[in-house]
Amino acid sequence: EKIVELAKKDAKNNIYMGNEFMNLRKAEVAKVAPNRAALIGKFNQSMSSGNMGDMKEIQEADKRWLCILFGIPYEAEYQGEGTGSAIHIYNEGGEEVLTYTQGVGWHEKETKAETGVHSALKSAYYEAYHDARKALNNGTNVEITNENVVVQSNFDMKA
């Protein structure tokens, strides 16, 4: 219902996916997203504490230590050598959520759950926005009641 309201409001203002919708979408995706900031924080804290001085030490760390560092249900894997080395962090479903490389730093990977929320919200918004724009272009008012869209004509019988 909130998405339909925002789409209708944006359609009236001739804005597609305005700030309010984007903020709502971000908040909804955050509900299913892994806490990447905490994962990055744990890694950075470990690197700066002197426990792990460089990627070579990470390479030598066993999988158990990497899992302890990032916490259950996350798993980590070190891959490669030299400048092409990377650490990959996986969620409980085996989906990669973060990658760290020395030259680039952190790179976030979207999970299937996050993609699903994005898709559902964008699809619902698109349909509601399209219906509202169509009604506006046809010179009708759109009234939202529950999840149904009721179209009322602006035709004036007295004119």
Question: What are the roles of these predicted feature ranges?
Answer:
Residues 1-159:
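Type III/flagellar secretion export determinants
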